[in-house]
């Protein structure tokens, strides 16, 4: 296990500055990770303000406690070790029914990718795992070895958008008939063997999309994000804001759709007024996603696929 939890925060200032932080407000970092967003947000709060920081990874919380120690001493932080799909439930337990802002940094964090034994990366040999919550029973091993051909094709297409999903699923099926597929390196080699030679010459690792698909399936990432963002929109006070960083098209599409549904209203034309229960809850702060600056892209390779979407609560 690595001793340090290194993580270069993506879109740090944009994500928090767009929240328009109120010094005495109540805020949530739904994806604590390396605590970069939390630390910057806390720097904008007075001792009367409060941050609730969620992460299902105990390691992330332990490291964040060191980084955020000055704010913890002032009683400004509450840590919640749980999947953010339980956002509303956990906040209710803490007596919180309204928040002034919330930020999300979706997907796997850099420390999780870099920690070899977590099995997230196709670049390092490790047991097939990919669990964000280490106490969960379901891992990448079960997906790769227990899912039938049709289920593998389904998740590879749906979550990896890989056009060679059928060929890869077939190769996996053949390989595990000989022996179980146990490591990330074994899986990466099987994926490579299923792709044509000209595909292997293209930029990017040939296993990237499939590893993404398995990771999303293991952690139900899109289902959790869908539930959590909808809960967050309901929890926001009027004028409260939500920031969501995404790293691939599936996350971005989901966020865009949820924001669109909450910021538009479907009423008959010519209606003299819109009833309160039909008024849009959100207003988009930016119609197009906010992208990292050229300077950030130069400093942080992970930022290249990042997109930030922000919205404001305008009606309960």
Curated annotation (Swiss-Prot):
GO terms for cellular component: cytoplasm. Its EC number is 2.1.1.199. GO terms for molecular function: rRNA (cytosine-N4-)-methyltransferase activity. Keywords: Cytoplasm, Methyltransferase, rRNA processing, S-adenosyl-L-methionine, Transferase. It is found in: Cytoplasm. InterPro entries: RsmH (IPR002903), SAM-dep_MeTrfase_MraW_recog (IPR023397), SAM-dependent_MTases_sf (IPR029063). It catalyses: cytidine(1402) in 16S rRNA + S-adenosyl-L-methionine = N(4)-methylcytidine(1402) in 16S rRNA + S-adenosyl-L-homocysteine + H(+). It comes from the Bacteria. Its main location: cytoplasm. Pfam families: Methyltransf_5 (PF01795). The keyword Methyltransferase applies. One of its GO terms (biological process) is rRNA base methylation. S-adenosyl-L-methionine binds at residues 35-37, 55, 84, 105, 112. Specifically methylates the N4 position of cytidine in position 1402 (C1402) of 16S rRNA. Belongs to the methyltransferase superfamily. RsmH family. PANTHER family: 12S RRNA N4-METHYLCYTIDINE METHYLTRANSFERASE (PTHR11265:SF0), S-ADENOSYL-METHYLTRANSFERASE MRAW (PTHR11265). HAMAP family: 16SrRNA_methyltr_H. This is Ribosomal RNA small subunit methyltransferase H. The lineage of its organism: Bacteria, Bacillati, Bacillota, Bacilli, Lactobacillales.
């Amino acid at each position: 296990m690595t001793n340090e939890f290194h993580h270069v925060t993506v879109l740090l200032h944009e994500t928090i500055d767009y929240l328009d932080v109120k010094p005495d407000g109540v805020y949530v970092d739904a994806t604590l990770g390396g605590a970069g967003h939390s630390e910057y947000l806390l720097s904008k709060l007075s001792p009367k303000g409060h941050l609730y920081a969620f992460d299902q990874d105990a390691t992330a919380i332990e490291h964040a406690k060191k980084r955020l120690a000055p704010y913890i001493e002032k009683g400004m932080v509450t840590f919640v070790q749980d999947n953010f799909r339980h956002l509303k439930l956990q906040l209710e337990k803490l007596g919180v029914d309204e928040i002034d802002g919330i930020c999300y940094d979706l997907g796997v964090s850099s420390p999780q990718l870099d920690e070899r034994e977590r099995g997230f990366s196709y670049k390092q040999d490790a047991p097939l795992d990919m669990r964000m919550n280490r106490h969960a029973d379901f891992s990448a091993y079960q997906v790769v070895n227990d899912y039938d051909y049709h289920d593998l094709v389904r998740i590879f297409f749906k979550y990896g958008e890989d056009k060679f999903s059928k060929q890869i699923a077939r190769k996996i099926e053949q390989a595990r008939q000989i022996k179980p597929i146990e490591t990330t390196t074994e899986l990466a080699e099987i994926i490579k063997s299923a792709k044509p030679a000209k595909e292997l010459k293209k930029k990017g690792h040939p296993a990237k999309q499939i590893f993404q698909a398995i990771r999303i399936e293991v952690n139900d990432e899109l289902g959790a994000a869908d539930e959590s963002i909808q809960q967050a929109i309901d929890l926001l006070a009027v004028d409260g804001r939500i920031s969501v960083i995404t790293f691939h098209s599936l996350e971005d599409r989901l966020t865009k759709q949820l924001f669109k549904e909450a910021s538009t209203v479907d009423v008959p034309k010519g209606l003299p007024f819109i009833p309160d229960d039909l008024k849009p809850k959100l207003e988009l702060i930016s119609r197009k996603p906010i992208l990292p600056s050229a300077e950030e892209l130069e400093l942080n390779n992970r930022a290249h696929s990042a997109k930030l979407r922000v919205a404001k609560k305008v009606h309960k």
